[in-house]
A protein has these predicted regions:
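Glycan-recognition surfaces
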Residues: 3-91
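Glycan-recognition and catalytic regions of carbohydrate-active enzymes
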Residues: 92-138, 173-180
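C-terminal beta-sandwich/jelly-roll accessory domains of carbohydrate-active enzymes
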Residues: 144-202
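Histidine/acidic-residue-rich catalytic or RNA/ligand-binding cores of hydrolases
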Residues: 1-4, 100
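C-terminal accessory segments enriched in acidic
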Residues: 56-63, 81, 86, 90, ...
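Conserved, mostly hydrophobic/aromatic
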Residues: 79, 139, 203
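Carbohydrate-binding surface patches
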Residues: 121-161
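Flexible loop/turn segments at secondary-structure boundaries
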Residues: 47-49, 86-88, 95-98, 146-149, ...
Length: 203
């Protein structure tokens, strides 16, 4: 029998009951992901004020925070291998960020190559994956509670070719605690000769 994936991890739904640690996402590539494809349900865009404190009072629970950013949620589609991906949030939340949701609509779920670019357990990881059915590459990077810049070495690209790269990035003002939903989208041309520093906000 062919196994596509299994859960076997504290997935995104646990943030609906209590908050996974801010470094939980950077643990999984070094632990659970070693055993194969994982169902994590990434793609949450409403990262705060998303639940009531009780069914009776229906006051917004301001202490409920998903320790992430929209940029990180998009990166998880590349970092976590899952051949049957999810869009884990409500349509009304995606409708506020349709430019970012376009990435979820278009990102592949199966890959022909994977390159680890940066990694340190519980701290950060970045990787590149090549779409199984095209010549397109995708790069994703995540960090823990500490902001950082990761140098992305594009030497994995085919030599002598130029690629248009669309980037979904945290901003300098993004922070998982108080500004998780700020992001920027930019484009630039890259080749196998390029090294680019990418900023990852806390969370």
């Amino acid at each position: 029998m062919y196994k596509r994936q299994r859960e076997g991890a504290k997935g995104q739904e646990f943030n609906g009951f209590w908050t996974n640690g801010v470094n939980h996402a950077t643990d999984l590539p070094f632990t659970r992901m070693l055993s194969g494809p994982m169902d994590y349900t990434p793609g949450v865009f409403q990262l705060n004020n998303f639940r009531y404190d009780s069914p009776e009072t229906k006051n917004i629970d301001e202490g409920a925070i998903v320790p992430s950013t929209i940029g990180k949620e998009l990166a998880l589609y590349v970092v976590y291998y899952s051949p049957m991906q999810m869009a884990a949030d409500l349509p009304k939340h995606y409708s506020k960020h349709m430019d970012a949701f376009a990435f979820i609509k278009n990102v592949p779920v199966d890959w022909s190559q994977r390159k680890i670019l940066n990694s340190k357990f519980r701290e950060y990881v970045s990787m590149a994956r090549k779409d199984k059915y095209s010549e397109n590459w995708y790069v994703g990077g995540i960090t823990n509670e500490n902001e950082r810049k990761l140098k992305i070495d594009f030497s994995f690209l085919e030599s002598g070719k130029e690629y248009t790269m669309k980037m979904y990035l945290d901003t300098q003002n993004t922070h998982w605690k108080d500004n998780p939903m700020e992001y920027q989208i930019t484009e630039r041309v890259v080749s196998s000769n390029d090294n680019i520093n990418i900023y990852l906000a806390p969370g």
